[in-house]
Amino acid sequence: MPGGYKGECGDDVDPMPFLAPPEKERIEAMNKPYDIKKSCWVKDEKEGFIAGEIQSEQGDQVTVKTVNNQTVTVKKDDVQQMNPPKFYQASDMADMTFLNEASVLNNLRQRYTNMRIYTYSGLFCVTVNPYKWLPIYGARVANMYKGKKRTEMPPHLFSISDNAYHDMLMNRENQSMLITGESGAGKTENTKKVIQYFANVGGTGKQSSDGKGQGSLEDQIIQANPVLEAFGNAKTIRNNNSSRFGKFIRIHFGTTGKLAGADIESYLLEKSRVISQQAAERGYHIFYQILSNKKPELIESLLLVPNPKEYHWVSQGVTVVENMDDGEELQITDVAFDVLGFSAEEKIGIYKLTGGIMHFGNMKFKQKPREEQAEVDTTEVADKVSHLMGLNSGELQKGITRPRVKVGNEFVQKGQNVEQCNNSIGALGKAIYDKMFKWLVVRINKTLDTKMQRQFFIGVLDIAGFEIFEFNSFEQLCINFTNEKLQQFFNHHMFVLEQEEYKREGIEWVFIDFGLDLQACIDLLEKPMGIFSILEEQCVFPKATDATFKAALYDNHLGKSNNFLKPKGGKGKGPEAHFELVHYAGTVAYNITGWLEKNKDPLNETVVGLFQKSSLGLLALLFKEEEAPAGSKKQKRGSSFMTVSNFYREQLNKLMATLHSTAPHFVRCIVPNEFKQSGVVDAHLIMHQLACNGVLEGIRICRKGFPNRMQYPEFKQRYQVLNPNVIPQGFVDNKKASELLLGSIDLDVNEYKIGHTKVFFRAGILAKLEDMRDERLAKIMTMLQCRLRGFLMRIEFKKMLERRIGLKVIQRNTRKFLELRFWGWWKLYNKVKPLLNVARQEEEMKAKEEELRNAMSKTQELLSRVKELEEKMATLSQEKNDLTIQLQAEQENVIDAEERLTQMMKTKMDLESQISDMRERLEEEEGTAASLSATKRKLEGEMSDLKRDLEGLETTLAKTEKEKQALDHRVRTLTGDLSLREDSIAKLQKEKRALEELHQKTLDDLQAEEDKVNHLTKTNSKLSTQIHELEDNWEQEKKIRAEVEKARRKAESDLKMTIDNLNDMERSKLDLEEVVKKRDMEINSVNSKYEDEQSLNSTLQRKLKEHQARIEELEEELEAERSMRAKVEKQRSDLSRDLEDLSDRLEEAGGATSAQIEQNRKREAELLKLRRELEEAALQSEAAASTLRKKHTDSMAELTEHVENLQRVKSKLEKDKQVMKAEIDDLNASMETVQKSKMNAEAHIRKLEDSLSEANAKVAELERNQAEINAVRTRLQAENGELSREYEESQSRLNQILRIKTSLTSQVDDYKRQLDEESKSRSAAMVSLANTKHDLDLVKEQLEEEQGGKSELQRLVSKLNTEVTTWRTKYETDAIQRTEELEETKRKLAARLQEAEETAEAAQARAASLEKNKQRLQAEVEDLTIDLEKANAAAAALDKKQRVFDKMLAEWQQKCEELQVEVDSSQKECRMYMTESFKIKTAYEESLEHLESVKKENKTLQEEIKELIDQLGEGGRSVHELQKLKKKLEIEKEELQVALEEAESSLEVEESKVIRIQLELAQVKADIDRRIHEKEEEFEATRKNHQRAIESLQASLEAEAKGRAEALRLKKKMETDLNEMEIQLDHANKNNSELVKTLKRLQQQIKDLQVQMDEDARQHEELREQYNLQERRLSLLQTELEEVRSGLEGSERSRKLLEQEVVEITERHNEVNIQNQSLLVVKRKLESDVQRISSEHEELISEFRSADERAKKAMTDAARMAEELRQEQDHCMHLEKIKKNYEITIKDLQAKMEEAEQLALKGGKRTIMKLEARIKELETELDGEQKQHVETVKTLRKNERRLKELVFQTEEDHKTNQRMQELVEKLQNKLKVYKRQIEEAEEQANQTLARYRKTVHELDDAEERAGMAETALNKLRTRHRVAGKGITSV
């Protein structure tokens, strides 16, 4: 299925024939003859299996007649049963009766020949490549499958996709679709269809967020495929559109299932295809698309010709693909670029790089004559490449032919031959294409990242299929390894995890081993010492080749692994195979040629550098990251470079982890034949793929197992409808309920299993349950429809009955009218009756019209009020939406800040790790350099000693030769003179022979010594060269260290700037969680630093151990050297003894000469000298060893001290972390309360909206009532009353809405105020955090400076020691070798002694100045002691006054507590009265409602009375009774009026009181706010004072550091001058010792002063604690009375004075007296403040009493109102009695009405007129009474409203008091924080004092070391004198 989307739109073609067989075809198949016992399948070589019919059976042999009329005899095991015809083209092969290979193959073959390519196979889907377009992928088919179950539609890829989409939404879990199969099986096309389906299902239809006219997100997701196919797909032997890379496409969805973005991960692009292809294959499509000449302007701009044969790299195989138009594909690719938002510059860059790669392949090189150097044949191609890639042509050619290579520390140009140049450009072309492809993927991901909220994703995997070619290389191994892992994942998921879940859930199950474990092959590839591991190892070896790689593979795996085979020989054609691997899909022979280079992937660094400077932006962007890895490789010690296989395996492991975290859906693609012909089936090929993919095993486990499962709650909820009666009412366990439900359904027990948490079903059972559920729901809906239709018909029948009754009444009245129409009286009645009602009707009409107008105006007002409320609700909802939008924006900003912070912290940690690594390496190099320099010096000394020994031996040899000649001459003279003494001559001859032997022996020894000396010189030269190299490396490391130090400083400065910016941002965002996260990150970083320090400590210890071992080795060498020297000395002693014997013999012979004696003396002197030198060398080695041990101990002590400091910092940070966690918990609790209140407010708003909707409905009802008033005149009054009642209800609701609105606005204001307070506290916390960080940084810097100074001192001391030793050795050697230089040395020493005298005089002057300082300090100490005594006396007096003040404060506190108790009791009484008032109010409301009902009844009775009066003729008595009733009503009305006026007056009084209280509360609140603001300003001033104090401390520390630096400088000067102090050193030592004593005495005095200072500080601390106690007590008074501002100001001023005193104590010791005096002043101020506070407290008590009296008065008023309400209730009861009397009178009137009907005809007009006039008067009076009654009701409601407002106001006041208390508590917390900061500052001051003492001790140590150096110089002087005497004696 090659690329593109054409031909798939089959909306005008019926797709069903391509999905499922038609009914006619199915019926024809079912009618075919079939015998279950005879129909079978037998094997066939061509068809795989062929149908047949069993003829006979004989034992194990079966005779079968095939459909080809052939009779065959086969074994019974080779015969497979045939399925019944009803399974013709089964959609799910798991449903077949007989599951065997023949049935599966036949089913797939039948469906494929009919182009039904999709078939279910249990839980997954099998698809066969049709090799042509089918109309089954259009929008029509997609809509058919959308939202459908799997069983409802024929098999299709869309069904699997829709199930994955449904599972994602239902199970809330990520999904993945694994589309696997061999190469050419159709994976890429199926992947495109899946992505297209998901894009359509979850499409939003929105344009991209860029606003550049791009397509929607779904269009961009779909259009990503053409770009990736153009650059990543190519033609292979088995597939015209083969993906030569792997991709995993994640399609992200939001919570509603809509698309939210996508991203793509690519795996292992086949780079080698860029430069080489096999014969029947082609390169990547993009090359041929560009060369198709569809865009001539593109060809022209890229300098190309439209013929692929002109370009070597793309024309090694075929250049045209059948059924693929490259020009059309180029247009599709270009359009896809536009849809994906690629800019024109990016497109041109991509095309230029692609064209440049094609030109790159045409570069030719030739060999220079008589040189191993290649050169470019023609520069035309290079010029084209340079033009397209933005390079310099000459530099490009030079970089390819003569690249720069680093050799040691220098770069040299290396010549390249032709083959190397071709390999270089090939590697560059592959690298450009690979990086461009990766950049394309990143760029597409950037477009598809929409920044929308992502909830879940569905991943679609498309990996290159399993490949078996004639030539299989490294790429095929990686592809096949990936497929092996995916097949193992499938097997593990389908067969292992499934059965493990059965066991886990407790289902009876026998584990089945399907034999599909591929772990052996995977282990062979990826485990340690596997193929990939060996490949990595060989890449590291410098001289590894393909042969060594092959040998390593054979040694490790041949014969040891069944999956590793040696290739079979004898093919004779094709490339050579080096080894074979047994994969799940077959055995593959691999050729390992070039694997090492492919894995290392080397590049020409010179050309890469040119690429980085390219003018083509895209090329420079692709290679700019080449610099970073180089640096990182240098910085990562011991880490190997990242190879291709290593990188690919990391990617694959991440992919497998992603797949394990998702729910997989498998689609297995099948290749039908190897000829790419549609409809042709290769049975053996298909069966091989089915066996390899585990299709049959998957069907078996699906049939045997329980593939479907559900959780018990879900099963109960979904299927309870099948039998709801079986589950009892009440609580029932879900598992028990499911068991009962399953037991009541007609299901076999074997068809399901009950697990611990789930119920499991066999295949198809869940679909059966779904069908049963659908049937049950259909029945329920049918029954419901029946009931509803019956109900509606009954209503219609009632209406019909009512109409029938109405018709009968009309008919009866008509008949009566026809009977009476001619009766005279009836005619008279008809004439008179209208005349009677004319006048009254006109008045009634006017009255009604007036009432109607009033009602209409009221309704208009009501409508306007409703509109206003709607507008207010709209504004409130708009404000709410704005707040939510602001909150979301703030949250997004916080998330962005967190991400930026995490990135910055990561970069910071990386930089710190790099810096620590560089420091470690630098320290190692310094240590090695130091050790090598020490060994160098030692070897130089030994070499000089050996040279001297050699010179001495040479002189000795010359002397012995001279002596030998003299002896020979002597013998000859003696033989001539003493010829008669032959015996003596013979004796002398013997002695001569002995001397010759001895001489020969000495010569041999000398030769051995010369050889040894030569060997030592050689080793010395080697060591010197190594030392030079190490020195060069050390210099380079110094440079690197300097660069790293600069980078570190820059990074630190950048980091500080970014941290400051982040702090500013955090202060503006009002979010405290950021601070907590930042603190956590800092703690983690400190922990990581602590771990790094621990690792550094361990490495240093390890290195120290190594140095100790090295020292031991050197000591062993020294011992060996000593033993060798002892041997030489022994030989020399033997030689001297022999010489002595010889001299004795010569004396016996003729006496020794004076020369021989002198020579013996010289030899003895030389021997003594050698012994002395050996002893000195031993002393030197021991001194060196002792210095090394001392350094080791010092370094260990420093490290332990550093570790302890880090531990202290860690503990402090952990405490801070705990504090911040507690603050976070508090903030979370407050946020929860805020959220709860917000939810309550939203609930109130919803209630208000409901009430508004009800009000709207009632307004509509009012309008209908008005319409009915016009229609029905008789019911006008009743409905008018109803309208007024509803109006009043709506008015009350409206008032209630307004009150709720005010409460909501007040809550919003409270929330805003709380938010402001939180922001202020957060900003204060941030400021304090920044201050502490700054202090910590300062302390760290000081500590580092001190450590640096200490190390500098140690280095100087060691340097002085080495200089002393070098001078000593040099002086001794010079004294021994040359006597002439001694005089010059003496002169130099005299000059230096003169200088030393000058320095000694300077030291004496300095000592005198120190003596003066001592005297001055002693005077200051005496003054300080006097001041201390005065301060102690003042402190004692202050203590006494403080105790008195404490007693006064305790008394006031007791009084305040009593007042608090009284206030609490009054508040309790107030609450009790409030509850009683609420009860009275509710009773009053009930009485009002009752009164309204009575009024309504009264109105109805009045109307009835009017009607009766109209009909009465003689109604005198009734008129009299009505007059009585009227009088009664008037009396009651007057009583009510009086009561209402009294209540109104009392309410007005209460209202004035409430207003006055509100004014007072507002004034108190303003005072409190003002005081809080002043307190905050005071706290800010305090903080600034603290900051100034800390800065002054810092300044003093800096001054102290400068003084220490000055002392160090002077000390260095003294140490440099020590070498010149030789003559007057004794005098200087004496002065120095006196100075040391003086310093010690001064230090002791300073220590005593320090003790006194500590005691004074302790006393001040006690005073400060007492003042803190006063402040706490005063703060308690402030919480209750809020009037103690002046006292707090005084205490704050005193606290400031105390802090200034602490600072002054650390700087100067002579200001204690001034501080004590200031304390006395503060004490007096405090006493005056306390008196003022007491007076103010009394005033506040009086105010509280007056407020209490006012509250009691309000309570009495409330009681009076309650009494009035009781009276009103009694009045209502009285009205109830009147109502009952009215009912009695109504009954009487009804009786009288019957009589009046008889008398009505008898009465005259005159009585009727009188009665009518009387009735009118009564009606007018009644109307007046009603109006007065309405006004009284209004006044009552008004009073009630005022009462509610008063209650609400009191509640608000109570809330404000609570808020003020909370504010005071927060202020107290702030005070505590500030006090804690003061304590920390004091701790820092103490630490600085401790450091000062420490520096004094170090100065003492330095002076002691100087004394030791001076004693050493004295010893040296004495030795020099002894040597001088010896020289003078010589």
Swiss-Prot record:
Superkingdom of the organism of origin: Eukaryota
Mark the transmembrane ranges.
Answer: none
Q: Give a yes or no for keyword RNA-binding in this entry.
A: no
Stretches assigned to the Myosin motor domain:
88-774
Q: Which residues form a coiled coil?
A: 835-1921
Where the record annotates domain IQ, the positions are 777-806
Domain Myosin N-terminal SH3-like: where? 35-84
Q: Which UniProt keywords apply?
A: Actin-binding, ATP-binding, Coiled coil, Cytoplasm, Motor protein, Myosin, Nucleotide-binding
UniProt region (Actin-binding), positions on chain: 652-674, 753-767
Query: Would I find Cytoplasm among this entry's keywords?
Result: yes
* Function text: May play a role in masticatory muscles contraction.
The name of this protein is: Myosin-16
Native organism = Canis lupus familiaris (Dog)
